[in-house]
Amino acid sequence: MMIPVSAAQFINAYETIQAENYSEASCASVLGLGSTHYLENCLDAGGGKNVFDWQRNTYFKYANVDFGSDAAYGFSARVADFSDHADLKIILDSINGPVIGTLHIVSTGKQQDWETQSCPITPTSGVHDVFLKFENNPAKASLNYFTFLHTVPEETVRPTYSYEPLPANWQGRDTRPDTWVATDMLGEAVADNRLAGNPRSNKYVGIFYHLFLTRKQGEVYDNSRLLEENYFDPAYGPVNTDHFWGKPIFDYYRNIDTYVIRRHAQLLYNAGVDVIIFDTSNAGFPFAPYWMAIVDTLYQMREEGLNTPQFAFHTGDGTDGTNKLAAYLYKNLYSTGKYRELWFMWDGKPLMLGNSTQLSAQYRNVFTFRRSWAWQSGENQFPWLDNTPQGYGWNESADKPEATSVCLAQHATTNKGKSYSGGVEPANVSEETTLELINFREQWEHALSLDPEFIFVTAWNEWVASNYYAAEGQDFLGRKLSANDYYFVDEYNPEFSRDIEPSDGFLGDEAYMKLAHYIRLFKGARAVGAANGSHTISINESFAQWDTVEPAFYDSVGDVTHRNELAYAGYTTLVNQSGRNDFDTLKVAYDAENLYFYVKSFNRFLIISLDVLICRY
């Protein structure tokens, strides 16, 4: 069945053709809203309407498009999509007619972030019915308008990543991060071997890693700044707009910023995190361009000899989302064997979190599945958030915990923040009480008492949440809202935020230091190397005199990459070209009169200033 929408006479192929002026459209039901539900309000310049396809391979017909006698060689369209996989096929005369071109839509960042993208077409003249058909669309792709070109355009090209398996005996450089001595902002020491004991086998830590920082256009809204400017009437952005709860230490970045990805990988590996768990739980959207950029960067780091966490996917708790994502990820990743070294394995198969109860055996047998949702525990569950004392998931026996969760905070709507303790969120939270991270400490202490195989930590880098209009009586920050007040669910401000990634506000790296502390208590830590007596070093003699000096301190090499990346919402370009000293090895020696310092640089370029604090260990 075809649905007539509007009748056209002749359409000039070289003028702007509004996508909503189609003459017919395929009859696929979208979101249960009816067969003609292809239109929505467009936030592109000029407003109006746009058409969209939501995972349904929709097509639109434009009748009597006149290409004239001077042939068209190109196609240009105003599109929005964040999947990086949707194709828009250009077909002549019937839906089964010749395909004259395919626009491979490159992610624009968000569903209403618009870009003009182009592709060449088979030279075309005369009058034709034109069909535009979306294919391979794992998310939501939208079209505002299009036109044809007399010239061959520069084709919009998706990023591609090369891959060759690492050697079977590959081992990364061991910098012994579990032996590093550290003190946090509160003056509390991070656990070492004396407190944590020796390393324990079969203990793993995963952390939720989010993929929401995608926007190339728009405004940056930061609730911490807005509340500071006007606490009682903050100037929030438009409804359903992402707001940061605070500013990341790396500025307002996008998930494809490789400078940030590299530092995330080092921070997490050094803290003892084994696996980053990509949050693809949102209605089956794969966020492909973003996790692909992250995974490829992790692979590049391993090629350079650097250790990194591995990865897995969280596909939500709905069967529809898990079914779509399992099929998509199998086809585009796991069946190819690509990045196999980075797959996090559980019971001999790649771990996937999701609801596999209605999944075909073809995919169910490829992965080890565990259900994973907030406040849920029990058989074959990997909970990601719970109230203290947290429940746990089990596999072999209900008496043997397999996995439990630890969260930094919960939700602004449930009024459970960083200071939540004993079932109560304090009425008057200060920076000092927030910085104590009471909820985080209590959750870790209970998780340690359970002693499972796996601890799922929430979270690393969510950073944003959308603002919504409240219904009468909506809970938010411990009070009832009036209708149409604004509220936020997951993230709101420093107290109600779950991100362990360091911020540039008063929280700094406190949560990160506590993460490292408790992971050592869970997994154990190697002993710090002991100093082996005094050594007198002559500056005029060979470096070989340092060979017997212990301990040695090692740094990751190749980690002084520069930065030049578009910021979130395109508000600026983030540039950092300060990388110089690529430290390799450091040692300290002493005798009765002097201290001696040895610094080896990977790139033979050193500018060093020493600020020495001598203390008794």
Give the location of each predicted region.
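Extracellular carbohydrate-recognition regions
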Residues: 8-34, 526-554
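Extracytoplasmic
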Residues: 8-161, 605-607
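Surface-exposed, glycine/proline- and aromatic-rich loop segments on solvent-exposed faces
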Residues: 537-617
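Glycan-processing catalytic domains of CAZymes
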Residues: 157-538, 542, 550, 605
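Residues within well-ordered beta-strands of beta-sheet-rich folds
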Residues: 74-78, 120, 129-133, 147-149, ...
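Surface-exposed, low-complexity/disordered Ser/Thr/Gly/Pro/Asn-rich loops and linkers
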Residues: 38-55, 255-263, 565-584, 600
